[in-house]
């Protein structure tokens, strides 16, 4: 048992979870900046031997982050993409195009985890905590710092001692140590759009 715990701790040292909202910036410049910050951070973390990245497989930021890791693997082959899926039929109500992309990401991921075998009110939360529990660091895209699943995940990661990286900062390497540092005072002014909204996603507060 102790050997397994030590192995899990060692694996955690090489992992970072990526979390964010389903809604991405509608402003092309803000979206480009987010992508640039994410790309730079993944490359920087790889130099620190953090090479395994967890994403939750949802639409919006999760999809963008997963595709970024897969894109960078062409020149950083040590990178690994781990998908933590909340339940088997997550993509059932998505559009055909989104489902095809989802299946392609699953096919190219290094590992795929099913956190729950069926949908429940807490399956998204379980998925988020699953990723944090296996990560040394947590990089996040968050414009709602109070009422969102992303905020809940970031707070849990902070309590677990993860290094936090705010992808909206100009220097995403900044380690967020306190809730005061993490707050984004101008967040409510950022224009966002609902990416591929469905009735289920609109009612789901987990992202």
Indicate where each model-derived feature is located.
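Acidic/glycine-enriched connector segments
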Residues: 2-187
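Intrinsic disorder/low-complexity segments, especially N-terminal tails and targeting/processing regions
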Residues: 186, 192-194
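Long, low-complexity, intrinsically disordered segments
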Residues: 194-207
């Amino acid at each position: 048992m102790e050997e397994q715990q030590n192995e899990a701790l060692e694996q955690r040292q090489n992992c970072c979870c990526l979390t964010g909202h389903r809604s991405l910036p509608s402003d092309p410049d803000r979206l480009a900046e987010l992508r640039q910050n994410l790309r730079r951070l993944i490359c920087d973390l790889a130099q620190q031997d953090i090479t395994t990245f967890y994403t939750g497989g949802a639409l919006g930021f999760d999809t963008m982050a997963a595709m970024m890791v897969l894109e960078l693997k062409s020149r950083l082959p040590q990178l690994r993409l781990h998908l933590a899926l909340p339940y088997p039929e997550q993509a059932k109500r998505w559009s055909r195009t989104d489902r095809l992309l989802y299946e392609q990401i699953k096919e190219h991921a290094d590992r795929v985890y099913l956190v729950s075998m069926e949908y429940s009110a807490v399956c998204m939360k379980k998925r988020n905590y699953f990723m944090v529990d296996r990560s040394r660091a947590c990089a996040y895209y968050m414009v709602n710092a109070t009422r969102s699943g992303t905020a809940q995940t970031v707070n849990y990661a902070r309590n677990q001692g993860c290094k936090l990286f705010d992808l909206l900062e100009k220097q995403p390497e900044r380690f967020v140590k306190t809730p005061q540092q993490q707050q984004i005072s101008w967040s409510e002014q950022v224009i966002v759009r609902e990416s591929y909204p469905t009735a289920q996603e609109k009612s789901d507060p987990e992202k």
